[in-house]
UniProtKB/Swiss-Prot annotation:
Pfam families: UQ_con. In contrast to other ubiquitin-conjugating enzymes E2, residues essential for lysine reactivity are absent: Pro and a His residues are present instead of an Asp and an Asp residues in positions 88 and 119, respectively. Changing residue 119 to D: Does not convert into a lysine reactive E2. This is Ubiquitin-conjugating enzyme E2 L3. It comes from Homo sapiens. Ubiquitous, with highest expression in testis. Changing residue 96 to E: Decrease in autoubiquitination. Changing residue 88 to D: Does not convert into a lysine reactive E2. The modification N6-acetyllysine is found at residue 131.
Length: 154
C-alpha cells in the first residue's frame, strides 16, 4: 500500500528531526493510517498545557488529505467542541499530494498559536477574541489549565 510506505518514511523523518511542538508521537506499526501525538504550543494562552491530537490518513493518502481531531478540549475559535479543526492546508480544495505531514502539523501549531477569527468554527469565541482579547486569553488560559495535558519535559 503506497500510503503506508509514504507514511512510514514521513514518520521516520519527523522522529529523526524531532519537532519540539509535536511530541509523544504514537503510531501502531500495524496501522500507519492513525497517528496520535501532543501539540505543545509556544504562545499564551495555550503555553501552559499540551493538546492530544489524532491524525487519520485515508487509504488514498497522499491523494486525499488527512483529518485532524483534537482529543483534548481546547478553547479556540478554529477548533469546535468535537475537536474538529478548520485548517486550510488540509481542506479538499487546497490539498496537494506533495504536502507532507510535518507541514500539516506546522500549520496546525501556527493556527493554535495564532487564532484566525476570520475563519471560525466557533463564532462566539471568534467574536470574544476579536472584541475582548484580554477576556478571551483569561478564559482560554483557565480552560487550558483545567483540560490541557501535562507538557512533556525535554
Amino acid at each position: 500500500m503506497a500510503a503506508s510506505r509514504r507514511l512510514m518514511k514521513e514518520l521516520e523523518e519527523i522522529r529523526k528531526c524531532g519537532m519540539k511542538n509535536f511530541r509523544n508521537i504514537q503510531v501502531d506499526e500495524a496501522n500507519l493510517l492513525t497517528w496520535q501525538g501532543l501539540i505543545v504550543p509556544d504562545n499564551p494562552p495555550y503555553d501552559k498545557g499540551a493538546f492530544r491530537i489524532e491524525i487519520n490518513f485515508p487509504a488514498e493518502y497522499p491523494f486525499k488529505p488527512p483529518k485532524i481531531t483534537f482529543k483534548t478540549k481546547i478553547y479556540h475559535p478554529n477548533i469546535d467542541e468535537k475537536g474538529q479543526v478548520c485548517l486550510p492546508v488540509i481542506s479538499a480544495e487546497n490539498w496537494k499530494p506533495a504536502t507532507k505531514t510535518d507541514q500539516v502539523i506546522q500549520s496546525l501549531i501556527a493556527l493554535v498559536n495564532d487564532p484566525q477569527p476570520e475563519h471560525p468554527l466557533r463564532a462566539d469565541l471568534a467574536e470574544e477574541y476579536s472584541k475582548d482579547r484580554k477576556k478571551f486569553c483569561k478564559n482560554a488560559e483557565e480552560f487550558t489549565k483545567k483540560y490541557g495535558e501535562k507538557r512533556p519535559v525535554d
